[in-house]
Amino acid sequence: ADPTFGFTPLGLSEKANLQIMKAYD
C-alpha cells in the first residue's frame, strides 16, 4: 500500500490508500 504508486493491489485510490495506512498506523 505505497502511496507513491497511487493505487493498492485492490485498486483503491491514493486518498483511500492513505486513509487505510492511517487506520493501520
UniProtKB/Swiss-Prot annotation:
UniProt keyword list: Antimicrobial, Disulfide bond, Fungicide, Plant defense, Toxin
Q: Which domain of life is it from?
A: Eukaryota
The post-translation modification note in this UniProt entry reads: SBTX is known to be glycosylated but it is not known which one of its two subunits is modified; contains 5% carbohydrates.
* Induction line: In seeds, induced by jasmonate.
Q: Any keyword Disulfide bond?
A: yes
Q: Let me know which tissues express this protein, per UniProt.
A: Expressed in seeds, leaves, roots and stem (at protein level).
Alphabetical GO biological process terms: defense response to fungus; killing of cells of another organism
Disulfide-bonded cysteines? none
GO MF annotations, alphabetized: toxin activity
Activity versus pH: the note is:
Activity decreases below pH 5.5 and above pH 8.0.
Self-association and partners = Heterodimer of a 27 kDa subunit and a 17 kDa subunit; disulfide-linked.
Note, other: On the 2D-gel the determined pI of SBTX is: 8.2, its MW is: 44 kDa.
What function is annotated for this protein? Answer: Involved in plant defense. Inhibits spore germination in C.sojina, A.niger (at concentrations >50 ug/ml) and P.herguei but not in F.oxysporum and F.solani. Does not inhibit vegetative mycelial growth. Inhibits growth of C.albicans and K.marxiannus but not P.membranifaciens or C.parapsilosis. Probably acts by affecting the cell membrane. Does not have urease, chitinase, beta-1,3-glucanase or hemagglutination activities. Does not inhibit trypsin. Injection into mice produces toxic effects such as dyspnea, tonic-clonic convulsion and death.
Protein name according to UniProt: Soybean toxin 27 kDa chain
Protein source organism: Glycine max
